[in-house]
C-alpha cells in the first residue's frame, strides 16, 4: 500500500477520529495523526485498516478554514492530490485546494461516500435499516394508526369514539359515558392519536386533586405518555427555568384548585400555547347565566385559548338540562349562546330518533315514512338509496346504515357529545352483596364512649367520620402501637374467609394505608397468607410490582390490600371477590371501589363482602347504601344527588348510630327518590346519541381489525433483530414475557425507555392487561419508535458489501442494491405521513443498469449473501470504485420515474380525501350548526399546505449494498 507524507486517510475501525494525515513512514509501519482529536495511530504498512480518502468531480469538500468548494478536477503529483474547483462562498473558479488542507472533522453522511471511505457496516445492519424503512412506511399507512398501541381491551364503543374524535382538527367534544364505561381511556386514546400523528404536541389535563395520581398512572401505564404533575412546589421550581413555568413541559397534569387559585398562574396557563385541554369531572363546574362559579370561569378562559378541548362529565340526564348546556357552551360559545333556544332544539330531535329506530328495526317502510326520511336528509339523488334500504336485496342493510349515518350527521349534538350507557354496552357482570354483621368489641365500646365525652365540641361531620373507623378511635387513646387487630372480629372473619377460599384472588379495600399495612402483617404472621399491599405512600414502580405479584396465578399473592387513594386508577378484573374492610363516606367512592373489579371484560360475577360492626356508623351506612340506593348491586347514577339532599340527616345518624329513630323512614324516602330519579333518567335517554356513540357494527369491525393486527409476527421478528443490533440483552421469562436489560456494548450509552434495572415486555395484549409490570410492545410503543429513530436518523446500515456465491454468474460480477427514500418535508401537524410517509424504493442493478429488484425478493436474496469484513471490503471497493460510480449514475437516472409515480399517487389521494371531507362538512354545515367555522377553515388551509408540501417532495439515496459474485 503506497503511503506518502501529507496524504489523507480514514480509519476503517475508528471512523469517529475523522480525517488522518500521514506524518511518518518507514519500511514496516505508517503513522497517522488525526488532527480533530489530536491522536496518533501506528499501523503496519502491509495490512493497515485504513482507507485512502479521494474525492471525485461533483463532490463538495470543506477546507480547514471552513470554506467549501465544488470539485471540478483532481490532479495527482508525487502521490498527493490537489482538488480544483469553484468556491461556494465567493463563487471564485479555478481554486486549488491541496488535500493536506482538507477539514479534519470530515463526516461521510451519503451512503456512497461512506462506502468509498471504507465506512462499511455489517450486513445485518443494512437489512435492518431496509426493514425499518419498509415497516415504518407501512405503519403510517395502516388504518387505525394511534389506536393499536395502548394497553387496553379492544372495546368497540371506546374505539369508535376515539377513532371519530382522534382524527379531527382540534377536537372539542363532551365525553359523557356512564360510570365504568371508560371515559378516561377514551380521552387517552384521543390524546395518543393526536400526539402520535403530530396533530397535537402540548397537552394540559385538569382534574380534581384526588384524581391527579390516577391520571398520571393511567396515561403512563396505558398509553406510555409521561405527564408532569404541577403543584405549588413544582410551579415555583419551574419559575427559575422559564418566564412561563408551563413552557418547561409538553404534557402537564394539574388540579382545578391549583389552576384557579392564582390569577398569575391562570394567565401563565392561558399563555402556554396548549394544543389540547382535557377537563375531568367537568360536571362539578357550577354555572348559571347570572352567576358562573370561579372554577367555571377559569376553564372558560382556558377553553378560549386552547384549540382542542375534551370535557369528561357525568351523563346529560344526571346533570340536568341547564348544566348540560353550560358544558356545551364551553366547547362552542358561538353555537350554544341561548339556553331557551337550546331547549327548543332538543325537542325537535325526537322525530329524528324515531326515524333512526325505524331504520334499525329492519321493517318495511311506508311511502309516508320514505318521504319523511327524504325531507329530513335533504339531499338530492337520495331516492336510489331510499329504494335500496326498502328492498329485499343484499344491499338493504348497508343502505339503511348509510341513511342512519346521514341522519346522525345532520341532526343533534352528535359531533360534540358522546354518551354510552350500560344498557347499550354488553359485557358487564352481576354484582352480589354479602353482608356480615359482627358484634362491637367492648374495647371499641369504651373508646367510643370516651371519645364522645372528649369530642363533644366536634362537628357532627367529624364525629361521623370518626365513628366509621373505630380502630382509629381506639388507637387515639391507646397509642399507635395498640393491637386492635387482636380483638377486632372483622380481622378474625377475614382470616377465616381467606383460608377457606385459598384458590380465590381477593381484593381487600380499606380507607387508610395504615390499616392495609397492619392487616398484611397479621395475615402473614398468623396464617401465612400471601398478601400484597397497595397504598399512596408507594412509588408507581412499587405499586406495579405489588399488582404484578397479585396477578400471578400460581405463585402470586392471594390478597391485595388497598387503601382508598392508593387503588385509584387501577383495575383488577382478573379477580372477582372483594372485601370492604370498612365503608367510604360517599356513594361516588363506593362506586369507585367496586369499579376496581366491575369493568367491561370481567369474566365472573362480582362477590362483594362487607363485614361490619353493629352499633357503629358502618351499620348505618351499609343499610343506607344497600336499602336506600341499591348502590352495592347496581351502579347508582342517582347516588350523589340523593346524598346531597339528605346529607345533614345522614351525618347525624352516622355520628350517633345508636339513635335509630326515623332512620327507616329516611331509607324509605331515599329508595323512593332513587326509583323516581332512575325512571326520569331512563325516560330522558337520547337514543339517537346512544346509537351514534356506540358505533354498532362499524365499531365491532374496528375492534376485530385491530385484533388481527395484534397477531402480526413481523413485529416480533423485527423487534428482536432491532434489540440485538442496538445491543440490548433479552432474557425469555416465559408466559410470553421477555426481560430487557442494557449491555456494555450498546449503539448508544443510554437508550430512551430502558432503565438501568431493565424492563419486562410482552407482545401479547392479554398478558399486558393482566401484568401491569410488563410493557405492551406494538409498533406504536416508544421502545420501537425510539429504536426506529435511532437506526433511521443516523447512518447505521447505510453502506455494506456482501458476497454472492453463485456459479451461474461469472466471478467478479457486480450488483449494486440501492435503497432510495421518497419523502416530503412538512410541519408534523400537517400529518403528511397519511399520504406520503418516507417510502423506500429498492433497486438491484447490474453494470448495464438492469433493475432485477422485481425478480429477486429482498429477504430471499439476503439469505443467499455472505458477509465481508471491513478491511477486505475496503480493498474490494477500491478495486471497483469506477464501476460502482457508473452504476450509481444509472440508478439516479431510473429513480425519478418510480419516485414521481409515488408522489403523484400521494397527491391524488390527498386531494381526493381532503376535498371530500371539506365538501361533506360544508354540505352538512347548512343543516347542522354543530360544525364549527374554524374547523372548515382549518381543513381548507390544511389541504392547501399538504398539496404544496407534496409538490416539493423529493428523493434521496438512503442505503446501498455492493454485491460481488464469488464461486468459493
Curated annotation (Swiss-Prot):
Keywords recorded for this protein, A-Z: Activator, ATP-binding, DNA-binding, Helicase, Hydrolase, Nucleotide-binding, Transcription, Transcription regulation
Keyword Oxidoreductase: no
GO biological process annotation, one example: regulation of DNA-templated transcription
Any one Gene Ontology molecular-function term assigned to this protein's record: ATP binding
Amino-acid positions noted as binding ATP in the UniProt annotation, renumbered to this chain: 177-184
Domain of life: Bacteria
CDD domains (alphabetical): DEXDc_RapA, SF2_C_SNF
Stored InterPro entries: Helicase_ATP-bd, Helicase_C-like, Helicase_RapA, P-loop_NTPase, RapA_C, SNF2-like_sf, SNF2/RAD54-like_C, SNF2_N
Short sequence motif DEAH box: positions: 280-283
Signal peptide positions (record): none
EC number: 3.6.4.-
Top-level EC class: hydrolase
Chain's role: Transcription regulator that activates transcription by stimulating RNA polymerase (RNAP) recycling in case of stress conditions such as supercoiled DNA or high salt concentrations. Probably acts by releasing the RNAP, when it is trapped or immobilized on tightly supercoiled DNA. Does not activate transcription on linear DNA. Probably not involved in DNA repair.
HAMAP family: Helicase_RapA
Family, per entry: Belongs to the SNF2/RAD54 helicase family. RapA subfamily.
Subunit record text: Interacts with the RNAP. Has a higher affinity for the core RNAP than for the holoenzyme. Its ATPase activity is stimulated by binding to RNAP.
Protein name: RNA polymerase-associated protein RapA
Amino acid at each position: 500500500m503506497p503511503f506518502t507524507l501529507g496524504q489523507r486517510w480514514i480509519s476503517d475501525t475508528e471512523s469517529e477520529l475523522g480525517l488522518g494525515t500521514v506524518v511518518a513512514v518507514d519500511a514496516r509501519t505508517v503513522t497517522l495523526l488525526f488532527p480533530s482529536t489530536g491522536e496518533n495511530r501506528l499501523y503496519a504498512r502491509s495490512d493497515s485498516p485504513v482507507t485512502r480518502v479521494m474525492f471525485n468531480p461533483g463532490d463538495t469538500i470543506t477546507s480547514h478554514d471552513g470554506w467549501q468548494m465544488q470539485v471540478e478536477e483532481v490532479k495527482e503529483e508525487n502521490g498527493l492530490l490537489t482538488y480544483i474547483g469553484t468556491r461556494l462562498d465567493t463563487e471564485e473558479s479555478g481554486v486549488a485546494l491541496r488535500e493536506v488542507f482538507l477539514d479534519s472533522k470530515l463526516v461521510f453522511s451519503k451512503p456512497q461516500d461512506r462506502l468509498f471511505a471504507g465506512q462499511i457496516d455489517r450486513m445485518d445492519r443494512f437489512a435492518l435499516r431496509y426493514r425499518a424503512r419498509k415497516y415504518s412506511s407501512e405503519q403510517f399507512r395502516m388504518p387505525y394508526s394511534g389506536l393499536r398501541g395502548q394497553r387496553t381491551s379492544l372495546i368497540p364503543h371506546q374505539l369508535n369514539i376515539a377513532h371519530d374524535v382522534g382524527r379531527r382538527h382540534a377536537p372539542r367534544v363532551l365525553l359523557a359515558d356512564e360510570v365504568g364505561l371508560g371515559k378516561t381511556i377514551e380521552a387517552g386514546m384521543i390524546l395518543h392519536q393526536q400526539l402520535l400523528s403530530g396533530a397535537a404536541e402540548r397537552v394540559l389535563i385538569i382534574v380534581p386533586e384526588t384524581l391527579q395520581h390516577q391520571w398520571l398512572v393511567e396515561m403512563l401505564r396505558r398509553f406510555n405518555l409521561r405527564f408532569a404533575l404541577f403543584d405549588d412546589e413544582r410551579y415555583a421550581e419551574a419559575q427559575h427555568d422559564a418566564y412561563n413555568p408551563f413552557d418547561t413541559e409538553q404534557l402537564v397534569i394539574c388540579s382545578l384548585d391549583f389552576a384557579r387559585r392564582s390569577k398569575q398562574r391562570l394567565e401563565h396557563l392561558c399563555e402556554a400555547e396548549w394544543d389540547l385541554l382535557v377537563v375531568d369531572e367537568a360536571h362539578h363546574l357550577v354555572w348559571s347565566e347570572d352567576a358562573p362559579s370561579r372554577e367555571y370561569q377559569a376553564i372558560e378562559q382556558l377553553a378560549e385559548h386552547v384549540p382542542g378541548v375534551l370535557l369528561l362529565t357525568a351523563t346529560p340526564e344526571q346533570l340536568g338540562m341547564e348544566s348540560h348546556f353550560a358544558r356545551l357552551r364551553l366547547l362552542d360559545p358561538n353555537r350554544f349562546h341561548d339556553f331557551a333556544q337550546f331547549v327548543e332544539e332538543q325537542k325537535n330531535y325526537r322525530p329524528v330518533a324515531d326515524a333512526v329506530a325505524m331504520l334499525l328495526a329492519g321493517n318495511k317502510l311506508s311511502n309516508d315514512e320514505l318521504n319523511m326520511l327524504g325531507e329530513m336528509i335533504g339531499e338530492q339523488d337520495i331516492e336510489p338509496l331510499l329504494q335500496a334500504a326498502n328492498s329485499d336485496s343484499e344491499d338493504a342493510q348497508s343502505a339503511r346504515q348509510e341513511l342512519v349515518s346521514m341522519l346522525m350527521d345532520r341532526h343533534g349534538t352528535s359531533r360534540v357529545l358522546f354518551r354510552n350507557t350500560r344498557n347499550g354496552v354488553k359485557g358487564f357482570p352481576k354484582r352480589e352483596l354479602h353482608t356480615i354483621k359482627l358484634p362491637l368489641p367492648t374495647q371499641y365500646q369504651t373508646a367510643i364512649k370516651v371519645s364522645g365525652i372528649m369530642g363533644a365540641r366536634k362537628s357532627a361531620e367529624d364525629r361521623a367520620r370518626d365513628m366509621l373507623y373505630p380502630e382509629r378511635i381506639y388507637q387515639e387513646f391507646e397509642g399507635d402501637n395498640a393491637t386492635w387487630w387482636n380483638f377486632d372480629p372483622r380481622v378474625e372473619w377475614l382470616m377465616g374467609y381467606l383460608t377457606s377460599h385459598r384458590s380465590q384472588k381477593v381484593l381487600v379495600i380499606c380507607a387508610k394505608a395504615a390499616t392495609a399495612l397492619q392487616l398484611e402483617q397479621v395475615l402473614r404472621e398468623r396464617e401465612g397468607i400471601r398478601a400484597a399491599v397497595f397504598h399512596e405512600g408507594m412509588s408507581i414502580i412499587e405499586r406495579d410490582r405489588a399488582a404484578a405479584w397479585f396477578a400471578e396465578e400460581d405463585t402470586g399473592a392471594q390478597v391485595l390490600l388497598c387503601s382508598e387513594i392508593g387503588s385509584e386508577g387501577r383495575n383488577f378484573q382478573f379477580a372477582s371477590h372483594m372485601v370492604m374492610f370498612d365503608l367510604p363516606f360517599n356513594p361516588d367512592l363506593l362506586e369507585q371501589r367496586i369499579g376496581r373489579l366491575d369493568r367491561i371484560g370481567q369474566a365472573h360475577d362480582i362477590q362483594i363482602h362487607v363485614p361490619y360492626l353493629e352499633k357503629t356508623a358502618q351499620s348505618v351506612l351499609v343499610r343506607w347504601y344497600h336499602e336506600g340506593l341499591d348502590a352495592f348491586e347496581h351502579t347508582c347514577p342517582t347516588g350523589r344527588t340523593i346524598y346531597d339532599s339528605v346529607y345533614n340527616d345522614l351525618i347525624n345518624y352516622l355520628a350517633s348510630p345508636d339513635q335509630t329513630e326515623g332512620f327507616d323512614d329516611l331509607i324509605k324516602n331515599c329508595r323512593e327518590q332513587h326509583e323516581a330519579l332512575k325512571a326520569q333518567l331512563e325516560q330522558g335517554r337520547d337514543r339517537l346519541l346512544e346509537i351514534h356513540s356506540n358505533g354498532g357494527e362499524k365499531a365491532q369491525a374496528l375492534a376485530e381489525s385491530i385484533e388481527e393486527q395484534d397477531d402480526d409476527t413481523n413485529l416480533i421478528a423485527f423487534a428482536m433483530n432491532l434489540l440485538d443490533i442496538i445491543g440490548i440483552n433479552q432474557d425469555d421469562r416465559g408466559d410470553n414475557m421477555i426481560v430487557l436489560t442494557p449491555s456494555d456494548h450498546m449503539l448508544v450509552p443510554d437508550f430512551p425507555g430502558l432503565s438501568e434495572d431493565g424492563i419486562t415486555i410482552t407482545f401479547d395484549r392479554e398478558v399486558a392487561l393482566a401484568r401491569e409490570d410488563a410493557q405492551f410492545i406494538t409498533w406504536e410503543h416508544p421502545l420501537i419508535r425510539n429504536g426506529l429513530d435511532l437506526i433511521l436518523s443516523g447512518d447505521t446500515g447505510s453502506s455494506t458489501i456482501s458476497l454472492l456465491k453463485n456459479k451461474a454468474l461469472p466471478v467478479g460480477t457486480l450488483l449494486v442494491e440501492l435503497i432510495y427514500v421518497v419523502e416530503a418535508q412538512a410541519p408534523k401537524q400537517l400529518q403528511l405521513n397519511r399520504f406520503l410517509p418516507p417510502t423506500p424504493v429498492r433497486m438491484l442493478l447490474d453494470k448495464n443498469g438492469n433493475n432485477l429488484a422485481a425478480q429477486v425478493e429482498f429477504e430471499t436474496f439476503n439469505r443467499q449473501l455472505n458477509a465481508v469484513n471491513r478491511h477486505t471490503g475496503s480493498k474490494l471497493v477500491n478495486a471497483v470504485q469506477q464501476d460502482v460510480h457508473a452504476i450509481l449514475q444509472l440508478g439516479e437516472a431510473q429513480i425519478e420515474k418510480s419516485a414521481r409515480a409515488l408522489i403523484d399517487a400521494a397527491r391524488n389521494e390527498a386531494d381526493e380525501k381532503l376535498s371530500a371531507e371539506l365538501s361533506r362538512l360544508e354540505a352538512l354545515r347548512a343543516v347542522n350548526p354543530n360544525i364549527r367555522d374554524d374547523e372548515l377553515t382549518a381543513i381548507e388551509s390544511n389541504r392547501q399546505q399538504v398539496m404544496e408540501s407534496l409538490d416539493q417532495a423529493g428523493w434521496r439515496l438512503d442505503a446501498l449494498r455492493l454485491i460481488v459474485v464469488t464461486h468459493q
